[in-house]
């Protein structure tokens, strides 16, 4: 016979939205969820290859998974989600695969913009955005501008991003400020460095 606690949990689950009900049933405390989740979107090509499928098909399935991740994160009330979608190393893949990934990114932005608006999601992008094809940059910038004032979850897309490249960028900015007298090198703190990183 089920205990009182189990009965109560089952009753509460029936009154909650599906995602929260699932979390309650698994015993996860909604008050102890993180405020920022970061996910490296990796392995789509390998997933497809293991199933004797085209790598590009794997990336298409990965794009579908992104929708689920964004929806779940938003429903949980997690304020910030960062998806590492395309690294600086990804430029070394075949031109066909890179082209397919850029096309997928553009389609994703176009199809998900209305969803972001409806759910108050604010889009942000980090990385060497200037390396993306111009048409992709245009759609990305339009989506960022359209969602800029949305008060809900922040979705960061890391595109043409690498942590080493970010450190180099931050170091160059600080060095340039120091050389032009706008920054005293002795005043550099952890906070100064954090303020010059993407997020």
Model-found features: residue ranges?
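Flexible, compositionally biased loop and terminal segments
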Residues: 1-199
């Amino acid at each position: 016979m089920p205990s009182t606690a189990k009965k109560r949990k089952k009753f509460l689950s029936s009154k909650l939205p599906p995602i929260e009900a699932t979390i309650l049933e698994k015993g996860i405390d909604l008050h102890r969820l993180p405020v920022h989740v970061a996910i490296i979107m990796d392995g789509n090509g390998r997933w497809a290859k293991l199933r004797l499928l085209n790598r590009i098909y794997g990336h298409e399935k990965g794009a579908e998974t992104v929708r689920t991740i964004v929806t779940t994160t938003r429903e949980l009330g997690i304020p910030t989600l960062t998806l590492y979608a395309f690294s600086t190393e990804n430029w070394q893949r075949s031109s066909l695969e890179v082209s397919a990934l850029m096309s997928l990114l553009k389609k994703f932005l176009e199809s998900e913009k209305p969803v972001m608006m409806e759910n108050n999601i604010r889009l942000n992008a980090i990385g060497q955005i200037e390396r993306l094809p111009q048409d992709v940059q245009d759609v990305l910038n339009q989506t960022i501008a359209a969602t800029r004032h949305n008060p809900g979850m922040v979705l960061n897309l890391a595109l043409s991003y690498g942590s080493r490249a970010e450190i180099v960028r931050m170091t160059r900015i600080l060095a340039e400020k120091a050389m032009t007298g706008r920054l005293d090198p002795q005043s550099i703190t952890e906070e100064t460095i954090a303020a010059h990183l993407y997020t």
